[in-house]
Amino acid sequence: PPDSSVNTSPEVVAAVIRLLKKAGAGRIILAEASAIGCDTMACLESSGIRKAAEDAGVDEIRDIKSDTDLVKKQIANPTSDITQVDLPRFLLEADHLVNVPIFKSHVSMVFSCALKNLKGVVQDIHHYVMHCTNLAAAMMDLGDIVRPTLTVVDMIRPMEGFGPHSGTPVEFGCVVAGQDMV
C-alpha cells in the first residue's frame, strides 16, 4: 500500500516527474526492477506509483526485469564478488538518471537509501548474487558504474524498525535532494 513506506511515495514520484517536465526534460521513463520474485508492474500498480506517474505525465514505464537489450558492464576495481553486471541499454544511453529512493531501515544494511535503491536497475540474477555477497560492497560497486545525475530522497514518511518490508512508517515530512548519492 502507498502508506506502508516500503516504496517511495507516489506523491514524490509524481512531483519529480512534474518538476522534470517543468525544467524542460524530453522523454521521461520511469524504470524499475522490483525485489526478487516480485512482479514489477504489479508492485508499481499496488503502490500507487504507476497511476501517480501516469497522471503526472510520464512518457513510459519500463520493467527492467523484462528488458532484453542489456549491456555487460565491467566493474573496474570491485570490492565485492560482483565483477560485472548487465544493465539496460536505454539506461546507459539516457541523458540523465534521477534516483528517487525512500529512506528506510534495512535488516541487511542498517538503512536503505540512494545506493541501495540502485538495485532497481538490475535483473533478478544480479539481485540474488548481490545478496549472497557483501551487500554493502556490492552496492558501492554498482554505484561506481551507475551514477545518477540527481538523487531525490523521500523522507516524508521513512521506515524504522524491521525494514525493508516490515518496519513502521514515521512522520518526518521532508524531501532531500543532491547530485552526490553518497
Labelled PLM ranges:
Residues 1-182:
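N-terminal and secondary-structure boundary signal
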